[in-house]
């Protein structure tokens, strides 16, 4: 299809919108590079999508997509073909450059998200909201591993991707590389996640791809467990409401701030 031609994806010719004045003198090694050609998704059985964002007031005000506060830094994809899973990270808004051409990535994602392939998210409302800021509509079927987890075990303390991945599919996030690079760039702990968009994609790519991989593995597991517990219909019913919940949240309600 139209995205198959070799992609002139690097946007190095474009003036970068972000300027990072604190480039470290010695950066951590990484051999990760973004894909030269956008991956073919048409024959995938299922796709996972996970966004990395600059969401500056997430903790105080909630997700910034509703008020256009922040931007999408990159999109991680997991494409499942039978037993094989291919993962990719498409950086489009990293501060220090190294991004792909965002209009290309946007067109590609529009095609993918409007297709009939099942799309898996972990906390879908968040990612769907941010995709909306890029003028991308996510067409059902939509699957959410957070919803699935809550149906399977309502007594858990937390439903974070990392802890669910470790507990259920033996696949957590490996943050060593990210933490090392983060320390060099001056970001640590909780501060690190919020500032990944300020770091070069070569450090964020492997971490983001892992998120997409864990999300897919988790869904594969949850799908079996939901079936086993006769919860498949209920799960689908709940997940089919996600576009409506998104529309309602996007519409918002009037609040008197006084």
Stretches found by the model and what they are:
Residues 49-52, 78-80, 122-123, 251, ...:
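Generic beta-strand/beta-sheet core signal
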Residues 1-2, 219:
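Short amphipathic C-terminal alpha-helix that caps PH/PH-like domains
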Residues 2-59, 68, 105:
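N-terminal accessory regions of nucleic-acid-interacting proteins
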Residues 17, 53-63, 232-258:
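Common nucleic-acid-contacting/processivity interface regions adjacent to the catalytic cores
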Residues 17-28, 70-73, 79-227, 237-238, ...:
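Active-site-proximal helix-loop-helix substrate-binding element of RNase H-like nuclease domains
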């Amino acid at each position: 299809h139209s995205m198959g031609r070799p992609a002139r994806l690097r946007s190095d010719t474009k003036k970068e919108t972000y300027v990072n004045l604190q480039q470290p003198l010695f950066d951590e090694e990484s051999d990760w590079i973004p894909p030269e050609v956008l991956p073919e998704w048409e024959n995938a059985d299922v796709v996972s999508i996970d966004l990395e964002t600059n969401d500056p007031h997430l903790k105080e005000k909630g997700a910034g997509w509703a008020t256009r506060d922040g931007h999408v830094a990159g999109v991680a994809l997991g494409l499942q073909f039978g037993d094989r899973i291919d993962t990719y990270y498409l950086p489009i808004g990293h501060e220090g450059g190294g991004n792909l051409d965002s209009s290309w990535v946007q067109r590609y994602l529009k095609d993918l998200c409007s297709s009939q392939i099942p799309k898996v998210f972990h906390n879908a409302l968040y990612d769907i909201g941010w995709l909306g800021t890029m003028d991308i509509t996510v067409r059902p079927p939509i699957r959410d591993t957070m919803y699935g987890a809550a149906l399977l075990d309502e007594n858990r303390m937390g439903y974070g991707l990392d802890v669910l991945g470790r507990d259920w599919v033996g696949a957590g996030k490996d943050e060593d590389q990210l933490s090392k690079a983060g320390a060099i760039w001056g970001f640590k702990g909780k501060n690190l996640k919020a500032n990944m968009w300020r770091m070069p994609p070569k450090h964020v790519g492997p971490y983001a791809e892992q998120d997409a991989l864990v999300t897919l593995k988790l869904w594969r597991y949850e799908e079996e467990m939901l079936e086993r517990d006769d919860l498949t219909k209920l799960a689908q019913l709940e997940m089919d409401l996600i576009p409506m919940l998104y529309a309602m949240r996007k519409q918002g309600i009037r609040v008197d701030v006084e």
